[in-house]
Amino acid sequence: MTLPLSIHGVVCKKDGSTVKINVGENDGDPVFCISDILPHLAQKQMKETASDFIPGESLDLILGSSIPSKKDEELKDKPAAKKAILKILKDSYGIEEDDFGSAELEVVPAGKARDLGFDRSLILGYGQDDRSCAYTSARALIESSKDTKRTNCCLCVDKEEIGSVGATGVGSHFFENALAEVVARLPAGYSELSLRRCLANCNMLSSDVNAAYDPMNPDLFDRDNASFLAGGIVFNKYTGSRGKSGASDANPEFIARLRNLLDNAEVKYQMAELGKVDQGGGGTIAYLAAKYGMNVLDAGVPVLSMHAPWEITAREDIVQAFNAYKAFLTLE
């Protein structure tokens, strides 16, 4: 647990101003961490199951240990270290303690992505699930041709790991409402039927990573149906747990069109499952988009050590994902 961490986010103050926070990424910045129990005193902890090994309440950050000046009378009723930290925050950012009630902060591993391996063919970085797919998708749209016959968009959503809930998850009506605004500006005007037809006629790639084959844990994978690092972008016909539970299952006609498109564009791709059927599974946002009747296929970068503090991808797969997303935007 004791890894260098950085803090990113915003603090919204009562006066309407917003303070951006980014501490731990630049040279010279301090970093933060979470303390570990020393093995000599961990007899009780070692008996816990993996899910109970570290309680959520034990994930507080170490922020400092300074002793404040005796002149700080307004902080005299607070613990010594807390006084010093609050003074630094006030002097550096103009933030009061109460302002954290209207803050949105993320704690992530500190440090930039790095080349991995002697040949520098791999990338080690945090949050590549799903930054590797979000970035390549956005870049593909930015660099796409403006002469396509279809309207293209890149929708970046969050909260996927907890069920795609909330206003910024794909479970919200944001995409549907945005499309309704487009339909309302067409010459024929808005109608509920026109909107539903438009949604049903969409083609979508659900940009999400897949588990790369791990040679150190081969028993978790069916090698014949696994994705491999440097094998290209991964297509998952279906996701889900222990088969297709909770899955979105792409139709073969749509997949065939994509295969033809990528073959003509000389894009490397592979078909895969997440792992052995009876080992577990996983889901994406594809099923939430498929409810509109549109064509949806999961397509993303294979990742090793998914959900670890530092995840591994291959440079080749990042390139092929970008090429695949860019080619997809030309689909008629």
Give the predicted meaning of each segment.
Residues 1-332:
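N-terminal hydrophobic/helix-forming segments and targeting peptides
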